[in-house]
A protein has these predicted regions:
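Acidic-aromatic substrate-binding/catalytic surfaces of carbohydrate-active enzymes
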Residues: 26-105, 113-116
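Acidic (Asp/Glu-rich), glycine- and aromatic
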Residues: 135-177
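Beta-strand-rich recognition/accessory modules
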Residues: 21-34, 39-43, 199-289
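Extended amphipathic alpha-helical segments with heptad-repeat/coiled-coil character used for oligomerization
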Residues: 184-192
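Short beta-strand segments that buttress and anchor functional surface loops
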Residues: 116-123
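Positively charged n-region of N-terminal signal peptides that target proteins for export
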Residues: 1-5
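Bacterial N-terminal signal peptides
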Residues: 8-17
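Hydrophobic/aromatic beta-strand elements that line small-molecule binding cavities or substrate pockets
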Residues: 128-132
């Protein structure tokens, strides 16, 4: 199995376009208090996030970011760093911009006020457009997924973030403002399974707050947002499709914005997180198909 995974990864590198092949194995990007790392082995999805020098989103082998799907009848996911099936995400184009100028990164970290990555790729039968931008200490991400034929799926995930196991508490807030507040238990269960726009994490030791806001979804009757409480991470992901058909000619859009704050008083962290969510909840109108 290990040989099969290694062969699939090496083959995927030969299939990369010249622009992507010019990128080093890892790219470090810094803007304000945020540092992210992109890795070739994860198809240049984000693979690590730090804030003020603190690790907040992990880069362990099974901690995947980005987009992944599982076709009906398959035990394996495809996309991002998943290579279990031997069928990996294939990067078609990759562009990186620092303060508006396109750059080809080297071994040194790149820094700027505004950093943007644009990527197109294929995942199984899907065409994926992905972009992220780091500006004003906020990470904004947008994913567009389309298919030329009907696809029967078990799951289609996007906006995945494996937040670090350091986080002790969570606060999930729905569209009406109702809160679900609790402590993580690392019991492999999900703290949330419905679509809600506001997810918040808190680390009592450091006082770090992470807030992510997902734009309303208008795709799929089974769309939802998950918060998986594991020992290795506290993972957030948007499920665009679950046990349903992804119709040909349609485009699914996932938009997520992430910000950070600090509050050492644990009695005040939820109110601070709510305030941060209001700042993050600024999305342009969704594109008409």
């Amino acid at each position: 199995m290990l040989k099969k995974r290694t062969l699939a990864f090496l083959l995927s590198l030969f299939l990369l376009p010249l622009m992507a092949a010019e990128f080093p194995k890892s790219v470090v990007l810094e803007s304000g208090s945020i540092k992210v790392r992109l890795d070739a082995k994860k198809m240049w999805n984000i693979n690590r996030i730090e804030w003020r020098g603190e690790l907040v989103c992990v880069d362990t082998p099974w901690a995947h970011y980005g987009t992944a799907c599982r076709l009906k009848g398959s035990p394996h996911f495809i996309g991002s760093g998943h290579n279990e099936s031997g069928n990996m995400e294939k990067v078609d184009t990759l562009k990186l911009f620092v303060d508006g100028a396109e750059v080809v990164p080297g071994e040194s970290a790149l820094s700027g006020k505004v950093i943007r990555l644009e990527k197109t790729s294929s995942i199984a039968v899907f065409q994926v457009k992905y972009a992220f931008e780091i500006k004003d200490d906020i990470i904004s991400e947008e994913t567009e997924v389309s298919a030329s034929e009907d696809v029967q799926l078990q799951q289609l995930y996007c906006g995945m973030h494996p937040w670090a196991p350091r986080f002790t508490d969570y606060c999930v807030i729905d569209q009406r403002g109702k809160k679900n507040i609790g402590s993580f238990r690392a019991d492999e269960d999900h703290r949330n399974r419905n679509f809600v726009p506001y997810f918040n994490w808190y680390d009592r030791k450091s006082g770090i707050i992470v807030s992510t806001v997902a734009a309303p979804l208008s795709f799929g009757k089974n769309s939802r947002r998950m918060l998986w409480d594991r020992k290795i991470y506290k993972k957030d992901y948007v499920c665009l499709v679950m046990n349903d058909v992804f119709p040909a000619g349609k485009t699914a859009v996932c938009r997520v914005r992430t910000g950070f704050s600090k509050q050492e008083d644990a009695q005040k962290w939820v109110s601070d997180a709510e305030a941060l969510c209001k700042v993050l909840d600024q999305f342009p109108a969704e594109k008409a198909e």
